[in-house]
Amino acid sequence: LGMYFFYVTMRARFFHLFLFFAFLAAAIFVGPHISDAQERIEEKVGKLLVKEFDPEKLTVQATGGGSFLYAKATGIVIKGVRIESVSLYAMMKEPPNNIKEDDEDHKYKLADLIHYSRGEVVLLEKDFTEYTSKEIEDIKGFKNLECDFSKNGIRVSGSYVATFLFTFNIRMEVLSKLAFDERGLCLTDTTLLVAGVKQPEYLTSQLLERINPLIERERIPFPVRITRIDFSDDRIVITGNPQPLKDANVWNYKRP
């Protein structure tokens, strides 16, 4: 149960991360409406992203007409979790004239105008560990959370404390990988251990059924391509290999 609530919490964080993608993609079409004011598209998009997410660093590229966009934000915090970097390459459709910036739903309407995109998210182990140690003190009895990244995936462990007639203090551990498939972003190749003993497959399957997908593909408000998920000792890279634009206008920002 403790592991379930932990992963439900993280599912919400991943969802807000993909909403960042949506805002980033939507922002490009705010630019053309003010082109007559001589503020370039990439500058307008960049300023919107800085205002919304306060990144440590940001690079935005855009073609002259705004049909193609590349943006990379470094050091953003989403729901308490620091994300090392988020990148997006997008090919856009023509914006309808009736969408306005002050429309409450403009972010999501504009996200629908993405024809094709590639995204990338880089999450560092040190940032995830800091989040679990400081922000998640107690999730339904789950204490002393520890997280470890490796080439084999993610290991999350901790003590589950519950009281029923008397107090239980059980060491629990989950070893898992991530996959992006037709359902969305999911945990896969998962092993559940309680007090060091591997649990039956049906228990692990029940846990995964309640957790997966972390992000439903249908809830991502625009088409984004993710081709692989790479694990190392210090980071996870969820990527569709977005590449910077060539011969495009560039706007750079660094937090003071």
Regions found by a protein language model. Give the residues of each.
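Hydrophobic alpha-helical segments of integral membrane proteins
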Residues: F6, A26-G31
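Short, Lys/Arg-enriched N-terminal segments with co-localized hydrophobic residues
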Residues: L1-T9
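Extracellular/lumenal and peripheral-membrane lipid-interaction modules
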Residues: V30-P256
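N-terminal Sec-pathway targeting helices
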Residues: T9-L19
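Bacterial N-terminal signal peptides
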Residues: F18-A27
